[in-house]
Design a protein with these regions (language model features):
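N-terminal ordered "arm"
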Residues: 16-60
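Short, surface-exposed loop and linker segments with low hydrophobicity and enrichment for Pro/Ser/Thr
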Residues: 39-46, 78-83, 127-145, 182-185
Length: 212
């Protein structure tokens, strides 16, 4: 992984223009439903959170990012709002140098937008590096892998009508601004800069959109 530093510095700063959208899901070791998004305490002594994005369309400063993936691993204290998060960012190794720089700027928060609001909570960047990333979506099931480091899966949970998943909106602490569909994580394993293994825990799924 790359040299530790401030995540918001990835990809540079200054005036930027970007708009990206696509598929997103996250898994964590909290019980369903995660209390962290409501500024409460995690189920365990810490929150191990893994986030995966697949860009279906979008660009930064004219650099096309369609079809590329990014994954972030987060290790936070029991209350995420206390800050001091340890994070690692993985960028799709299929990207060109120009695309990788743009991808890193967008998903680190360095380009501004929604993710920039989480930057003050980060205490340590364990690394930022290219990786072979797989992102798959089949109906209400999603799966992502970072070769040699991470595997995560999620199944959406059906709501009261027996057909559609439950939806959470307007949570005060979230990596996305869009309504999130409730899901359950399964067979999650991360062995990168730290280790975390869990299953049957919380997951959220949505169609993300960032711009700045």
């Amino acid at each position: 992984m790359g040299r530790p530093g401030r995540l918001g510095q990835c990809g540079g700063g200054g005036d930027v223009s970007f708009s990206v959208e696509g598929d997103y899901f996250e898994v964590c070791n909290c019980e369903v439903s995660c209390n962290c998004i409501w500024l409460g305490a995690a189920t365990n002594d810490n929150c191990d959170l893994l986030l995966a994005w697949h860009v279906t369309s979008g660009n930064k400063d004219g650099v096309d990012l369609s079809g590329l993936n990014a994954v972030m691993a987060v290790h936070s204290p029991k209350r995420m709002t206390d800050g001091g998060w340890k994070v690692a960012l993985y960028l799709d190794d299929r990207a060109s140098a120009e695309q990788s720089e743009a991808l890193g700027a967008v998903f680190s928060g360095g380009a501004g937008g929604h993710l920039a609001g989480l930057a003050p909570l980060i205490g340590e960047v364990a690394g930022v590096a290219p990786a072979s990333i797989t992102f798959e979506k089949t109906g209400g099931s999603l799966h992502a892998e970072v070769a040699g480091a991470l595997s995560m899966s999620s199944d959406q949970l059906v709501g009261m009508d027996g057909q559609e998943p439950g939806v959470i909106t307007n949570a005060p602490l979230s990596a996305v601004a869009q309504p999130m569909r409730q899901a359950r994580a399964k067979d999650v394993s991360y062995h990168g800069h730290w280790s975390a293994d869990f299953s049957g825990t919380n997951s959220f799924v949505t169609d993300f959109r960032y711009q700045g």
